[in-house]
């Protein structure tokens, strides 16, 4: 690591987003990972998808080993000017109305549970009455 820290702006770092020129921001530090693109176990797409933003969460979510963290030092090129990094937006779910289940099917089922046995009983009585021999 160089003794003098170079401070880079977010705009400058975000322009390095290609396979042949790839810089990442991880924990406030800027890394030129271009030489590592072919060697990265996850492939270059993983690294490219983390450009143009603070890749700290992407890096930490994978759970890199201590060896991987030590390897990063040789790709270190400077610090990011935190005032130039856009604020990360947190996901806000769209507001949805409360679930209002239609009670009609439940009501109809209760009515049918009451009426069907009565109709069967009534039909049985009618059939008995007409089939009764006098």
UniProtKB/Swiss-Prot annotation:
Entry annotated with the keyword Transport: yes
Residues that hold heme according to the record: 40, 64
Keyword Phosphoprotein found: no
MF (Gene Ontology): heme binding; metal ion binding
SMART domains on file: Cyt-b5
Pfam families given in the database record: Cyt-b5
GO CC term, one of those recorded: endoplasmic reticulum membrane
Transmembrane annotation, as ranges: 107-127
Disulphide connectivity of cysteines: none
Segments forming domain Cytochrome b5 heme-binding: 5-81
Protein's cellular compartments: Endoplasmic reticulum membrane; Microsome membrane
Membrane topology category: Single-pass membrane protein
Keywords: Electron transport, Endoplasmic reticulum, Heme, Iron, Membrane, Metal-binding, Microsome, Transmembrane, Transmembrane helix, Transport
InterPro entries in UniProt: Cyt_B5-like_heme/steroid-bd (IPR001199), Cyt_B5-like_heme/steroid_sf (IPR036400), Cyt_B5_heme-BS (IPR018506), Cytochrome_b5 (IPR050668)
Family label: Belongs to the cytochrome b5 family.
PANTHER family, A to Z: CYTOCHROME B5 (PTHR19359), CYTOCHROME B5 ISOFORM E (PTHR19359:SF135)
Job of this protein: Membrane bound hemoprotein which function as an electron carrier for several membrane bound oxygenases.
Name of the protein: Cytochrome b5
The species this protein was found in: Brassica oleracea var. botrytis (Cauliflower)
Origin organism lineage: Eukaryota, Viridiplantae, Streptophyta, Embryophyta, Tracheophyta
């Amino acid at each position: 690591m160089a003794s003098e820290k170079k401070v880079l702006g977010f705009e400058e770092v975000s322009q390095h987003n290609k396979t042949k020129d790839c810089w990442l921001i991880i924990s406030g530090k800027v890394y030129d990972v271009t030489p590592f693109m072919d060697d990265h176990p996850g492939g270059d797409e993983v690294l490219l998808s983390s450009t143009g933003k603070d890749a700290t969460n992407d890096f930490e979510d994978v759970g890199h080993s201590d060896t991987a963290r030590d390897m990063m030092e040789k790709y270190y090129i400077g610090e990011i000017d935190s005032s130039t990094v856009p604020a990360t937006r947190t996901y806000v779910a769209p507001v949805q109305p409360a679930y209002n289940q239609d009670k009609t099917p439940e009501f109809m089922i209760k009515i049918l549970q009451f009426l069907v046995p009565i109709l069967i009983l009534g039909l049985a009585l009618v059939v008995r009455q007409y089939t009764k021999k006098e």
